[in-house]
Amino acid sequence: MSNIIKQIEQEQLKQNVPSFRPGDTLEVKVWVVEGSKRRLQAFEGVVIAIRNRGLHSAFTLRKVSNGVGVERVFQTHSPVVDSISVKRKGAVRKAKLYYLRERSGKSARIKERLGE
């Protein structure tokens, strides 16, 4: 039974997911349904957490919009997610960047990772 489940999950995995780490700035394009129309909506933010669970993998992005912090969790292999692109690579030393929630302004900046 578990072989069948693994095979089905393997078929549903997306192949075009770029590699990214916490601290990186990503732009995620998501399909949004408004009435009878479908359109792409972009969300750009810093990766503050990654959850690696195969088909159930997810990552959390954070951005500050009009002075308000906005966090959004995306399922990596969801059909709602159209594309993921890495805009900037960040140099951090932790896997979870929840400390950015209490910071604002210059203290919330992340250094850029060079040499990769």
UniProtKB/Swiss-Prot annotation:
Highest taxon of the lineage: Bacteria
UniProt cross-references to Pfam families, sorted A to Z: Ribosomal_L19
One GO term of the biological process aspect: translation
Keyword Lyase (UniProt): no
Family membership: Belongs to the bacterial ribosomal protein bL19 family.
Task of the protein: This protein is located at the 30S-50S ribosomal subunit interface and may play a role in the structure and function of the aminoacyl-tRNA binding site.
Official protein name in the record: Large ribosomal subunit protein bL19
Native organism taxonomy: Bacteria, Pseudomonadati, Pseudomonadota, Gammaproteobacteria, Pasteurellales
Gene: rplS
